[in-house]
Amino acid sequence: MIVAPAEANNQAARTSAQTRRRVAVLGGNRIPFARSDGAYAEASNQDMFTAALDGLVDRFGLAGERLGVVVGGAVLKHSRDFNLTRESVLGSELSSYTPAFDIQQACGTGLQAAIAAADGIASGRYEVAAAGGVDTTSDPPIGFGDDLRRTLLRLRRAASHVERLKLVGKLPATLGVEIPANKEPRTGMSMGEHAAVTAKQMGI
């Protein structure tokens, strides 16, 4: 941690404000909203984000163009989606040289992506950038329960056939899946329930 006098911090803030460039939103694109398990039941986050990007490309004539960056993300991601935004860029008509990275902050993911892109433009790192978010409840990342996952990992590490057979014998007792729940892990309440509590406490 670096600590500086308040005067120095204020001076740095003034200097930063003077050198930061103005940022403008030039346009946008999205795919239509649809009910869960409806039109997009077989579509992945990557499918939908790529489609939204290609719509942006078509709308603004960006085919083959290299942008400064594409920032995006999703809340419910499969393990295969660890590089979701980059893979979506590679699947789009944008130049494959366009950098991209993921960001995640609950339902504010798309907004935080836009802020990150705008900050990059304001500081001079990029001339132009794209940002967005995507999520589907039709294709949630259903995972193994901890017991099954740990047993499978032990099976992979087993050094002998005898050890493997013992572990295989334990599998039926450890079967289980985990489906993402619409609730905060610490409170067990959904975002809507939290909003209701907040409104009640603040008299809204």
List each language-model region with its residue ranges.
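Acyl-thioester C-C bond-transforming condensing/cleaving domain
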Residues: 2-21, 35-43, 49-64, 82, ...
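Residue-level detector of conserved, well-ordered beta-strand and adjacent loop positions
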Residues: 26-27, 104
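Short polar catalytic/cofactor-binding loops
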Residues: 28-33
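Short glycine-rich or small-residue beta-strand-to-loop segments that form or flank ligand, phosphate
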Residues: 70-74
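Glycine-/small-residue-rich active-site loops that bind phosphorylated ligands and cofactors
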Residues: 76-77, 109
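Short glycine/threonine-rich loop-to-helix capping motif typified by GTGT followed
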Residues: 78-84
